Every structure is written in C-alpha cells, then in structure tokens.
Amino acid sequence: MPEMAGWTGFYVGVNAGGGFGTAKNDFSIAGAPSFATVDLPQKGAIGGGQIGYNWQAGPAVFGIEADLQASSIKGSVSTPPLPLSANYSQELPWFGTARGRIGYAQAGWLLYATGGYAYGRVKTVASATAGPATVSVTTNENGNGWTVGGGAEVMIAPRWNIKVEYLYVDLGTTTISYAFPALPALNNNTHVTINVARAGLNFRF
C-alpha cells in the first residue's frame, strides 16, 4: 500500500445500501386506551451523501459527520373484505443523521463507533373500503430520535477512502390523527426503528 496521509481534515462522500426494521403502531379512539397494536415490517434501499470532519491524535481519531438519505424503505398490510377491507402502509422517503465519531487508526485503516441525532419523514396511507365506497387518508410526519452504530474505513489513495457502516436508527414516536366521515377520530402512535447497512466513498480535502 502506498504511503497515506493522516485522517485529519474535511471530507465529502456518497453512499448506498439498504435498511430494514419495524413500525410499531398503537391505535386508539378519542383518547381512549389503545385497542390494537400492529408491528409493520419494513425494508428497502437507501442512497445519499455525507459530509464531515476528522481530527487525528496519534492512533485516535475524533470526528463529526452529517448525512442525508433518500429511501425506499416501506411496509404495508391489508385485511380481507369481510365486508370491510382496510389497507395500511408506511414508508420512509428520506432520513438523516448528525453524529459524533471516535475511532482507532492503523496502517491506512480506521475502525470507529458513532452515535447522535436522527430525523426523517414518515409517510402513512390508510384506507378503508366497504362496498363501492373507499375512504383514504395520507399523512406526512417528521420523526426525531437517535442513532448508534459503527464502521470501518480504508484509504485507497492519498485523498480517497472507502467505508462500510451499520447504524441503528430510532425515529421516536409520532402521533397521527385520522378523520373519517361519520366515524370517531382515530389516533395512531407510530414508532419507527430501522437497521441500516451501507457502503460509501469519501474524498478528503
């Protein structure tokens, strides 16, 4: 391997990968206790970019990083028409993180742990069909929570490195209210958690 510079400096990069997880949904009517819980499995592809800064002191590396991801992570469930059918789907169109990093560098490699703030958009589509009539409601809510994970990077040229990374992302609980004609309001507390695995390429300034 050719001689490489250290890890100190700003960098930008791109990444791609996938994610899977669960959206836990608790349903209640007009503030009453929850009457049903639905755990909705979700999975899909992700892709995006990151920007960050590293500071190296001996083998120790400290850093900050922010990323933003486009996502196709989603899940859905349907009930048979007996005589009312219902369809419920949730997706994560985008999400991002802002994290601290701490790692150990040796011979062009960097192993690190990371954690911090996570945020994202949770899109929900709920519909009910009875005979010829269908009622559908679409909501978009912003989730806020935390993330933790780790990864490895290796220098492939003086200013370039590749990376692999795992993150556990918890977007917290958001509350959705559905208003269907001639029916009491339905409240839905949804808690989204996902596991993210991705690979990336960084350019260091």
Language model features by range: what are they?
Residues 1-205:
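Gram-negative outer-membrane beta-barrel domains
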